[in-house]
Amino acid sequence: MSFGGPNSTPLPSSFDENADFYNENTIDKIWRRFREEPLVPLGCGLTVWAIVGATRSMRKGDHKMTNLYFRRRLYAQGFTIAVLVAGNMYWQKDRLKRKEYEKKVAEKDRMDKRDRWLRELEMRDEEDKAWKERMAKKARGAADEAVGVTQMVKEKTKELKDQTVGK
């Protein structure tokens, strides 16, 4: 008989799961931001177009077109910044609501994790108590058995003495 630990299989832990798995991933976030502010990528595209045009005109040696493309780059970057500021002002309330929602979700997750942790501790405590009780019963049973054997030896010895003395 083995008197090992209470149970060899570990209990499921509340720390095993990965909560980040269910949250928004990077690609979803990019697409959401693209839907929220569709003019920002347009401004970035215009900026890239102007830089590519300026590079080509510089290679050709056309200074007039190079300056024109650099001005267009400045206008495109100004447009991008203006769109960012306008979009930020427009979506500010939505972002505040989203932060509140995320805070509530985080609080709920924290409380769920705490409750799972407490349940896990209670289960482990109950298992430990049951194991200690089984070990105490086995120890009492062994002690009772030892007392019973000693008593039987005494009785048998007395019986044998009586038989030998009686003869």
Swiss-Prot record:
Keywords: Membrane, Mitochondrion, Transmembrane, Transmembrane helix. Residues 11-102 form the HIG1 domain. Pfam families: HIG_1_N. Coiled coil: none annotated. The chain crosses the membrane at residues 39-55, 74-91. GO terms for biological process: mitochondrial respirasome assembly. It is a multi-pass membrane protein. It is found in: Mitochondrion membrane. Belongs to the RCF1 family. Cytochrome c oxidase subunit which plays a role in assembly of respiratory supercomplexes. This is Respiratory supercomplex factor 1, mitochondrial. The gene is rcf1.
